[in-house]
Amino acid sequence: MTAIDFHGVFPAMCTPFHQDGSIDFETLRDDAQRLESAGVDGLVPVGSTGESATLSHDEHIEVVEAVIDAVDDVPVIAGSGSNNTKEALELSRRSAEAGADALLLISPYYNKPEQQGFIDHYTTLADAVDLPQIVYNVPSRTGQNIEPDTAAELASHPNIRAYKAASGDMNQISEIIERTRDEDFAVLSGDDGMTLPMLSVGGTGCISVSANIEPERTCAMVGAALSGDFERAQAIHHELGPLFRAMFVETNPIPVKEAMRIRGYGPAHLRSPLTRLSDEHLDHLRDVLATLETEDLEDEYAEAER
């Protein structure tokens, strides 16, 4: 199994599209290189932020391959989850063959399995594909919560190495961290506004939407917290707070794609049924981004000990 350190910042990448809906691979590669140059610890293509639900299986793997080809040393964690275990297994195997360093596996959605169903699903994938795997719990999207007992049982599998927490429940997240501390197991934030609170109780980093827009600041915040400088981490957290909130005023990735367009990082085109950011939120997003641009702190953040 490939070794990977699940500490730090892992941007959940967007999949850029041309106006006709085809994938803009040139922009995708440029974006991967921009984020790697900013100092992130890994890249996560074809997850929820990457609109994986609208990609064919072949497109899914083509995006993974393009990101891998674009970067030098940064690990690539491919989203390969599904609500169909057989389909998740196919995507996971193909992602591994494409050269992915690890897999991000959203819990089965819509069909709402019971806890034993989660255990069976993830164990099947972990037994079959010899890559580090991240269990992803986001009940607001999937309709079902992965409970702490289930997370703790899954953490004992040698290929299940991390848990992405986006439940919004700090008591639950804290319990999972407590119960897996003796395992070689990482707990990552999947909610930018919860990243610093999670780091304060033993979380190891984040799979972040906002890091697409502010990678240096996000790396500085996480790096400061991991090194014990919570005063600095807190200051950056509050500096980024308006961005964290702006990224979720509408369904992800609608706001982040608009922010990418405003910053000149790529187009805001989305695949149906997602639609462009509404005018009522667009002006506020511009204001948030303009405020962040008033201070040129990139060099300071890039030099922060991480």
UniProtKB/Swiss-Prot annotation:
One of its GO terms (molecular function) is 4-hydroxy-tetrahydrodipicolinate synthase activity. It holds the Pfam family DHDPS. It is an enzyme of class 4 (lyase). Pyruvate binds at residues 49, 207. GO terms for cellular component: cytoplasm. SUPFAM superfamilies: Aldolase. Its EC number is 4.3.3.7. It is found in: Cytoplasm. Pathway: Amino-acid biosynthesis; L-lysine biosynthesis via DAP pathway; (S)-tetrahydrodipicolinate from L-aspartate: step 3/4. Its main location: cytoplasm. The active site is at 136 (proton donor/acceptor), 164 (schiff-base intermediate with substrate). The keyword Methyltransferase does not apply. The record marks 48, 110 as: Part of a proton relay during catalysis. Catalyzes the condensation of (S)-aspartate-beta-semialdehyde [(S)-ASA] and pyruvate to 4-hydroxy-tetrahydrodipicolinate (HTPA). HAMAP family: DapA. Belongs to the DapA family. This is 4-hydroxy-tetrahydrodipicolinate synthase.
